[in-house]
UniProtKB/Swiss-Prot annotation:
The lineage of its organism: Bacteria, Bacillati, Actinomycetota, Actinomycetes, Micrococcales. InterPro entries: DNA_helicase_Holl-junc_RuvA_I, Hlx-hairpin-Hlx_DNA-bd_motif, NA-bd_OB-fold, RuvA, RuvA_2-like, RuvA_C, RuvA_C_sf. GO terms for biological process: DNA recombination; DNA repair. This is Holliday junction branch migration complex subunit RuvA. Homotetramer. Forms an RuvA(8)-RuvB(12)-Holliday junction (HJ) complex. HJ DNA is sandwiched between 2 RuvA tetramers; dsDNA enters through RuvA and exits via RuvB. An RuvB hexamer assembles on each DNA strand where it exits the tetramer. Each RuvB hexamer is contacted by two RuvA subunits (via domain III) on 2 adjacent RuvB subunits; this complex drives branch migration. In the full resolvosome a probable DNA-RuvA(4)-RuvB(12)-RuvC(2) complex forms which resolves the HJ. Has three domains with a flexible linker between the domains II and III and assumes an 'L' shape. Domain III is highly mobile and contacts RuvB.
Length: 214
């Protein structure tokens, strides 16, 4: 059983991480939020859950033990498969899940695509007394910075730039802020990244001087 992987990030796109461990590349399914915290060429460690089906073996990866436990508990709920469990973790972190279950707030789960009213109620019912958070709420400065850069990348993607271009611009903006001794907060990074991307066209945008199709 593969419980964790540590290696070099070869590529990350959407919900798929390709991690090289001692010359072997492993494809790992992760949440988009987790994917945005990973960088090509960097070292990464993921805790994993191997889901076995008749026609497939799929690795799901998580940044910490709380996410892994929440995923496995969700997969044990009637009507919740691994993809739906991953979708829940994209919208609710383990602490938010624990709070929703404790408050019997099934509406928090109904907001997740693919989770209907019946399944949401089952999640609350079947996870009662099982879900808890083992790590402290306070985040390190590094973790907070990763979240800020991930949020800026997401914002740029929403404005039409590709993930690759957005990542590069945000990394450059963060490096510039560090060189100048300035705080790398979201407004600053977004403003600087947009300034760097100014001359470029977002993916799918009409070329300069041409009207968009109507």
């Amino acid at each position: 059983m593969i419980s964790s992987l540590r290696g070099t990030v070869l590529s990350v796109s959407g919900q798929t991480l390709l991690l090289e461990v001692h010359g072997v590349g492993y494809g790992v399914s992760v949440t988009p939020r987790h994917a945005l915290e990973l960088r090509n060429g960097s070292e990464a460690t993921v805790l994993t859950s191997l889901v076995v089906r008749e026609d497939s073996l799929t690795l799901f990866g998580f940044p910490g033990p709380d996410e892994l436990r929440a995923f496995e508990l969700l997969c044990g709920v009637t009507g919740v498969g691994p993809k739906s469990a991953l979708a829940v973790l994209e919208h609710l972190d383990p602490e938010a899940m624990a709070q929703a279950v404790a408050a019997e707030d099934d509406a928090a789960f109904r907001r997740v695509s693919g989770i209907g009213p019946k399944t949401a109620k089952l999640i609350v019912l079947q996870l009662a007394g099982k879900l808890f958070v083992t790590q402290p709420r306070a985040r390190s400065a590094t973790s907070a910075a990763s979240t800020v850069t991930a949020d800026v990348v997401t914002a740029l993607i929403g404005l039409g730039w590709s993930e690759r271009v957005a990542r590069t611009a945000v990394d450059d903006a963060a490096a510039a802020a560090a060189d100048q001794g300035l705080p790398a907060d979201m407004p600053r990074l977004l403003r600087v990244a947009l300034g760097m991307l100014g001359p470029q066209q977002p993916a799918g945008a009409a070329p300069t001087g041409q009207a968009a199709d109507r």
